[in-house]
């Protein structure tokens, strides 16, 4: 939590930036799509030099966002920019779907050249405290929240907040194949793995998608290798998996979308809210469930095709709303769609 000294320090250091940094939060009028040429900015991630492993979940979100945009805008053009330095963005004016986790500091805030659409967004407690210190007014702010804690925070702030879930749930369902006969354990710790039934352990292949090692270290282009690794891991799940057991949200959600049976294990209480993106879809098991043999190791494929349809329509109509081209009937439809997304089960 911020103490009194920290609050004064932040206000002194950043108060002159408040208007500029938060100018893109509200429902400012975006150019029509034709005026920005159908340009969309997607997130890439520049990790701290010296770190030798990377979380593919970041790029799985980028892949899902791109896939969804391509469904609703056949003429979309894409470029990539570092998520954590949007305040410095200096490229062509573009729309950015703000699907993701924010953030370690204020530099993620889009400047006037980015037209942010907040769908699938999570704000950390640190950023919520930062907003509180700066007393940000969110009355004109619309946000589609990835999780329930972000939703609760912005509802209390008087924002137009709704539960959008995570866009990784919109990936297209795979074709069924006889080659889909592998069991993947994704980011399970040793204690969890040791408690699995013998028939699972005998067949299982362990994967760590949160710590992928980059083969060719090149700070300028390494994000492209990460992106390709994320594409490859999704293809591996789609073409080979008969069951995925994981502790990772951005493994569970895309695998559910692909039509793979999933078992989600919750490492601790911290993950309970993180997994609220899957509320009504898949309930996570706890460590005690695993220890006490309360897990169904033959889960069914979950049918979320209706939810995908609603999430696709939500993005399409939300873009129209931000461009002020939404008519009254579409406004009613959008509200109905968001309600269906929030209460899907």
Model-identified regions with their sequence ranges:
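Active-site anion-handling motifs in enzyme catalytic cores
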Residues: 2-345
